Amino acid sequence: ISPQEAMLRADGRTLLVVVDTNRPEQVEDADLLMACNRVAVIDHHRVAATYIHNAALGFIEPYASSVGELMTEVLQEVVDQNDILRCEAEALLSGIVLDTKSFTIRTGERTFDAAAYLRRAGADTTDVKKLLQTDMDDTVAKYKILQSAKLYRDLAIAVPEEPQNRVVAASAADEL
């Protein structure tokens, strides 16, 4: 649902679950974060200096490859594998594939165990690959960012000429 719809539905019993970040400035909607009294944070990044302070639950595991890996481990403990929908398994597997660059970085035994579990739950790797494909406009935008990169003290720095969506910007940053 949209942040606006979530804001309309939120009440005193609402639990807002924030995934893949623990920084309030990176959430989809800061107003929604502030409006919810109960917040859970599930993340695989190190705790930032500006972490979400009002979290009732913090599941932050920097040694995990991805939030997909963490959530798969949770699912294995609380849900019967047959109850996981194929689209859910594919969404989790796509997160693992994306964050590990197709299992080439930040992987460990837990990563592969999670992927195997999701395959058994019905995730199709061909469909996962399709989920991760970008359209031509996003590809062009990414390569414009890469083309603008400059080296400074052995670091590549790129500043897009136009505002980009976060997925395109993150993809370009991964390439640098």
Regions found by a protein language model. Name each.
Residues 1, 5-15, 98-176:
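Hydrophobic helix-and-loop "lid/oligomerization" segment in the mid-to-C-terminal part
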Residues 3-4, 19-22, 42-45, 74, ...:
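Fold-independent oxyanion-binding glycine-rich loops
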Residues 26-28, 50, 105-106, 167:
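Short helix/loop capping segments that flank catalytic or ligand/cofactor-binding pockets
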Residues 1-35:
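N-terminal small/polar loop signature for handling phosphorylated ligands or for N-terminal nucleophile
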Residues 31-37, 114-117:
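Catalytic-core regions built around general acid/base machinery
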Residues 15-17, 38-42, 57-60, 156:
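Hydrophobic/aromatic beta-strand patches that form the interior of the parallel beta-sheet core
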Residues 44-114:
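Short alpha-helices
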Residues 8-11, 31-34, 51-52, 84-86, ...:
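Solvent-exposed alpha-helices and their adjacent loops that cap or buttress functional pockets
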